[in-house]
Regions:
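A structural signal for short, well-ordered beta-strand segments and their strand-loop junctions
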Residues: 16-19, 135-136, 167-171
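Short acidic/polar capping segments at secondary-structure boundaries
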Residues: 21-23, 97-99, 140-142
Length: 171
């Protein structure tokens, strides 16, 4: 129940929501929009067996806590991202680079437009009352495929560290 979660955050708790499909009510309440992606295991199997390039997720969170770093994941895990989140304050954690797929088509655009539209966030923190809501659009990164792949567990631990000393309950 969204109301119950937001009341917890309002009282000072930290809530982490990891999904590639958030409810419209949650998106409207927290003023964000997330793309939806469909996962096909067949595509992952084909991709994993090849030597194709992986997608990059850039850690852009507080550099005093963690240095900026690039993590490489199978593209099938990084298809969802936040398109709109500007109307309320957010703390940016991680973004994906969509500009590489556009080639020279972006040459005519200014850097602000490119940054906003082609470097969308995949993880962010939205303040809510006395607490926070951590939003992550890449749930498949939290599976064994994502955690056990190369050095990517570091990315997952950085996301989870946003909860701090509070207990983590997975549902």
């Amino acid at each position: 129940d969204i109301d119950a979660l937001l009341k917890m955050a309002d009282r000072g708790n930290k809530i982490m929501l990891v999904s590639s499909s958030f409810t419209k009510l949650l998106e409207d309440t927290l003023k964000f929009d997330c793309t939806y992606s469909y996962f096909r295991s067949v595509d992952l199997k084909k991709y994993a067996a090849s030597l194709l390039k992986r997608d990059s997720i850039y850690w852009i969170g507080d550099p005093k806590v963690y240095p900026q770093q690039i993590f490489r994941f199978y593209p099938q895990f990084c298809k969802s991202y936040f398109r709109q989140y500007d109307s309320l304050p957010v703390r940016k954690l991680a973004e994906i680079d969509l500009a590489k797929d556009m080639g020279n088509a972006l040459d005519e655009l200014d850097s602000t437009t490119v940054s906003r539209n082609y470097h969308p966030l995949v993880a962010m923190v939205r303040p809510w009352g006395k607490g926070e809501v951590v939003l992550v659009s890449t749930p498949l990164l939290f599976t064994n495929y994502g955690v056990l792949d190369e050095k990517n567990a570091t990315y997952i631990f950085r996301i989870l560290s946003q909860i701090g000393e509070l207990p983590v309950v997975r549902t």
